[in-house]
Amino acid sequence: MDLAALRTQQQQLAASVERADRLDRDPPALIGGADVGFEQEGEVTRAAMVLLTWPELELVEYQVARVATTMPYIPGFLSFRETPALLAAWEQLSQKPDLLFVDGHGISHPRRLGVASHFGLMIDVPTIGVAKKRLCGKIGELGDEPGALAPLMDKNEQLAWVWRSKVRCNPLFISTGHRVGMDSALMWVERCMRGYRLPEPTRWADAVASRRPSFVRWQANHG
């Protein structure tokens, strides 16, 4: 595997990421959520995609796609491993969201191309990265209280907002994916909170992917 070529490709793609707001529909009618996991000891990549209405944040559609994993796990190159399954799930949706939350990083990546940015470029849809762990950069001083906020910085460049969404929970790393500004990304994540650590779009995507009780109950109520 030619990592140098992939690194160059990342740098070229990162230059095309739009870091300012460009939503085709504002406010959005549908907000999507995406989550990727792996099955069969990594041999299969599974992507879950959900659609929620705005502003109700009610789940109206979900799709799960499974594809053969074509690339090993290599730190910093995860988007090449995850985007084939994301694209398969995206293509199964009967409608497309106006804004998509992706479980993972956007520009808060060593080469400014996490999966939220990479996939956003592929489908040319506004995306927001919602990650649970830091990949690069330094966190400013962050309080312990819910709502505490600090920038994630690298070489005098802000890569993300580090935001503690709930008491006694690790913070989220919220970043521009594509066609959404940094402050707007934070605003939309805040607006999509309903008392959990994660915003509803990625919380539901995770629930669908892992068949959590909340999703099982939803299925029972919706046939």
From Swiss-Prot:
Q: Listed GO cellular component terms?
A: cytoplasm
Q: Does the keyword Nuclease apply?
A: yes
Q: Which cofactor does it need?
A: Mg(2+)
Q: Where does Mg(2+) bind?
A: D35, D103
User: Where does the entry annotate site (Interaction with target DNA)?
Assistant: Y73
Reaction catalysed by this enzyme? Endonucleolytic cleavage at apurinic or apyrimidinic sites to products with a 5'-phosphate
Q: Name one GO molecular function term.
A: single-stranded RNA binding
Domain of life per record: Bacteria
Print the keywords alphabetically: Cytoplasm, DNA damage, DNA repair, Endonuclease, Hydrolase, Magnesium, Metal-binding, Nuclease
Question: According to its UniProt record, where is this protein located?
Answer: Cytoplasm
Give the EC class as a word: hydrolase
Checking InterPro entries in the record gives: Endonuclease-V (IPR007581)
Q: What is its EC number?
A: 3.1.21.7
Q: Which GO terms describe its biological process?
A: DNA repair
Record's function text: DNA repair enzyme involved in the repair of deaminated bases. Selectively cleaves double-stranded DNA at the second phosphodiester bond 3' to a deoxyinosine leaving behind the intact lesion on the nicked DNA.
NCBIfam families reported in the protein's UniProt record: PRK11617.1
Q: Which family does it belong to?
A: Belongs to the endonuclease V family.
Q: Any idea what this protein is called?
A: Endonuclease V
